[in-house]
Structures are given as structure tokens and as C-alpha cells.
Amino acid sequence: MSLANRLSHLNITGGNDFKASIGPSVGRQNEATNPWSSTSHSLENSAATVVNELQTTKEQKTPEQSTTANPLFPGNDFSDFNNHKSKLLGVITGKSTPSSQAEKSDTTNSKTGSTEELTETPADENAKQYMLESLLPIIRMEDSEMSTLQLGCDLAALGFDLAPVEEDRLISTNLFSPWAELNTKKPVSQPMFKLPACYKNVNPPPAISKIFQFSDETLFYIFYTMPRDVMQEAAAQELTNRNWRFHKELRVWLTPVPGMKPLQRTPQFERGYYMFFDPIHWKRIKKDFLLMYAALEDRAQSAVHS
């Protein structure tokens, strides 16, 4: 209700007296008993003046001026205020009102053309697959292959008995593969290769069992290149069986020259021609040498055991 209507409801007009509306007797009594009677008369006159000015201004306004929007309270019947109130209620409750829907349509039409002309960019289309909207087809199982990949597969649907027989039983002990029946069939295409016969030998004999077939140079190579190994011991034993002796001081192997007898022999030493094997130059050298029996390694001839 406007200010003019409220004042008119109180019967306050420019030519009427506030006391007249109440009654003559009451007005005189108030004048006699109210010490602020002079002040009330001035307030009544001021209010009457304001009402007269409002009515005069209202009568002078043209229809076009009366419909001009007021920046504080737009519209005489507060229609814009009600529209704004309905918008707030729509935002809070999530329900759109007719006024808000009409305004949305006006706003979209006021922009460049209509919203139907707007097209999505490739970047927007690629971004949709990482949003929550992309999970809806998977949850609804619209694509069976994609649902199996994302959500997995029920083992019971594959014919596997999941009834717990034992508490510590593992599924891997019974279910080797969902496609285990395919392993019994022959492959569609045979591989184009042949396996060599050497790959089919199972547990070949150890190399030490064939050490008697090696040459002297091979035995020397094994002895000097495999220290503290079982093959070094086997090579030393085989060289001893072939009449080679190891000199502990010189750290070389020597043997008497075949067909030549010792020039001198005693219980402690003997002198004659011997064949030495030089590991540095890797060759055999013939020398006249005085051999002390105590300098030789004490090793008896015996078979090499694997």
C-alpha cells in the first residue's frame, strides 16, 4: 500500500481536519487535556501538505511517465519485485518459474542468433569422456564389452564353482584360465620352424667325463685359467696321468724327453733333458736340467673322477 493510500485511509486530506473525523467532542477534549496540541496541529498540516503534493504530482503524470521504471521500487504494483522474488525461489528450490523461463528465452534470443546455432568444439567433445556423464553408459551396461572391461566379469557366469570347500583353497588351483578348453584344440597355423636335435638332449654328460679326450694344451689352459675350480684339479690329475709333473718352485709343468735316459740319477735328484711348458709364451721348451725330487708336487697317478 502506498503512502497516499495509507494517509487517505486515515481520512487525512488537504481540506479536512483530523479532529473532525474523530468527532467534535473528542477533539475538544484532546485540546483541553493534551499539552502538545499545538505541535499536533502543525504535524497535521504538514501531512496534509505532503498528501496534496503527491496527489497533484500523480494527476500531472502522463501514462507514459507512470509506467517509467523506478530504480528503487520498479513498477507501481511491485511486479518486478515479485519477479525477482520468484527467481530467488527458483534458484533455491531448483524449480524454474514461468517468469524465469521467459527471461531465459529472451536472453538467449538477444545474443547472436539462437542457441541452436552454437556448436561444440572438438576440445569439449574430448573432455566429456573424462566427466561423470561418461560413467552413465558403463553403469547402465549399454555396451557389454566396455562394461566387462570396466566392471569385470562374474566368475559364476563362467561355470566356475565358487562354493568354499576348504578355507584356504585358492581359486588359482582350480581355475587355470577361462578359455582352458581352447588349449585342447590344435593351433590354427603351425609354426614354420624345426627344432634342432641338440635342443632335445636332456641332461647331457658333464664336461669332466670327457677330459681324457682333451689335448695337453687344452689341459694347460684349464689349469691356468680356472684357479681353485674342480676343473683345475681334474686337468692337473690328467696331466699327471700323462707323465707331466708340476714344479712347485718354478710353477711350470715338465716331463722327460721321450727316448732319452737321465744322465745322472741319485735318491735326491736326477739330471737329464726335460720338456718344459712355458705358460707366458705358450710353447714347449727343451732344457738340460737338474731336477730335485723334493721340488715336485707329490701326486700319484689315478683316474679322474667326475
Curated annotation (Swiss-Prot):
Residues 1-44, 56-79, 94-126 are annotated as: Disordered. GO terms for cellular component: CCR4-NOT complex; CCR4-NOT core complex; cytosol; nucleus; P-body. Transmembrane segments: none annotated. One of its GO terms (biological process) is nuclear-transcribed mRNA poly(A) tail shortening. This is General negative regulator of transcription subunit 2. Belongs to the CNOT2/3/5 family. The keyword Ion transport does not apply. Residues 27-44, 94-116 have a biased composition (Polar residues). The keyword Lyase does not apply. InterPro entries: CCR4-NOT_su2/3/5_C_sf, Not2/3/5, NOT2/3/5_C. Coiled coil: none annotated. Acts as a component of the CCR4-NOT core complex, which in the nucleus seems to be a general transcription factor, and in the cytoplasm the major mRNA deadenylase involved in mRNA turnover. NOT2 is required for the integrity of the complex. The NOT protein subcomplex negatively regulates the basal and activated transcription of many genes. Preferentially affects TC-type TATA element-dependent transcription. Could directly or indirectly inhibit component(s) of the general transcription machinery. It comes from the Eukaryota.
